[in-house]
């Protein structure tokens, strides 16, 4: 039997603390070489603004096997009343290959993306960080706020986006209530950056939206949005001045304009990347080494994140009797 799990089921079963813990283990396993994760297969349809990806992974130690199909269609909300990001995840039995669960992957994508930033923040941000800033207030920003609050002892979170002030205020009010942390609107991206100890960028920008002169010493940056070649959120000088940690170096070189563009400009080399988050977790390389350096976690999103979280959701669903059983063989 296959367990069918909808968005509400996933939301009830996958908390941010659990997601961060399972992702820490997944990144460590990838670094240790006990996970298989082929390059994602991507299809782009510019005629409809569509980005389609198929992302398989097998974490041998964790026993998680599966694949995610995810799409990003920018016109969905306005034209069809659908989310921009739509995903579905298959979880398979590692011994038989049988699909044991099919679940909504849209919400899970937001949670796991935030959780990765949370794990990176745990390892790379200054321990005395008290103010975080999030640039972007779309659906994917929700998980980022939750993860930052979980990862650091924050007194305040600043938010800024190009959306209207009422939408930003609604976002701030909602998450102030959920987290118990003061969430306020910044007047500009620059004012947010200058005040924050931790900054997460989660936008669909095509050109840099921050300037290297804005960062104060010791800032930790999570560069999460604009994860495609040729587009970026960060200017070249920011990448040059930061200690760069990737979710996976080769994936960032292949897909992240934030890294790819400086390399193509001839002012940054792949060897300048400090390493992968899993290597920091496993103690193979140093993370933050002093309170003055600027650290940058660049993430394009990996299948190990989806499949490890989905496997956890499936196990918890079985324990709690959540979901609908369905027999595909009838």
Which sequence ranges carry the predicted segments?
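Glycine/charged-rich beta-loop-alpha catalytic/anionic-binding loops adjacent to active sites
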Residues: 95-105, 158, 183, 289-294
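Active-site glycine-rich loop that binds ribose-phosphate moieties when present
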Residues: 116-117, 139-146, 174, 181-187, ...
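Glycine-rich adenosine-cofactor-binding loop
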Residues: 117, 125-151, 160-164
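Residues at the starts of beta-strands that form the adenosine-phosphate
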Residues: 131, 155-156, 182
């Amino acid at each position: 039997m296959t367990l069918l799990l909808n968005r509400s089921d996933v939301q009830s079963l996958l908390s941010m603390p659990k997601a961060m813990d399972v992702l820490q283990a997944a990144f460590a396993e990838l670094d240790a070489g006990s996970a298989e994760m082929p390059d994602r297969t991507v299809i782009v349809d510019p005629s409809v603004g569509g980005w389609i990806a198929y992302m398989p992974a097998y974490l041998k130690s964790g026993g998680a096997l599966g694949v995610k199909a995810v799409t990003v269609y920018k016109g969905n909300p306005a034209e069809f009343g659908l989310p921009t990001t739509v995903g579905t995840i298959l979880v398979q039995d590692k011994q038989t290959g049988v699909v044991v669960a099919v679940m909504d992957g849209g919400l899970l994508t937001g949670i796991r993306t935030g959780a990765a930033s949370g794990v990176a923040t745990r390892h790379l941000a200054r321990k005395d960080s008290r103010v975080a800033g999030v640039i972007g207030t779309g659906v994917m920003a929700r998980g980022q706020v939750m993860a930052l609050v979980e990862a650091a002892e924050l007194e305040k979170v600043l938010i800024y986006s190009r959306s209207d002030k009422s939408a930003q205020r609604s976002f701030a009010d909602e998450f102030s209530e959920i987290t118990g942390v003061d969430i306020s609107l910044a007047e500009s991206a620059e004012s947010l950056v200058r005040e924050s100890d931790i900054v997460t960028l989660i936008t669909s920008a095509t050109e840099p939206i921050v300037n290297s002169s804005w960062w104060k010493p010791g800032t930790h940056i999570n560069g999460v949005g604009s994860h495609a070649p040729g587009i970026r959120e960060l200017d070249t000088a920011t990448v040059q001045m930061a200690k760069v940690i990737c979710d996976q170096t080769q994936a960032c070189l292949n897909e992240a304009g934030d890294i790819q563009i400086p390399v193509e400009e001839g002012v940054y080399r792949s060897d300048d990347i400090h390493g992968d988050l899993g290597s920091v977790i496993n103690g193979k390389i140093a993370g933050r080494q002093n309170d003055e350096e600027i650290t940058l976690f660049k993430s394009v999103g990996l299948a190990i994140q989806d499949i490890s979280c989905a496997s956890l959701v499936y196990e918890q669903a079985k324990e709690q009797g959540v979901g609908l059983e369905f027999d595909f063989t009838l």
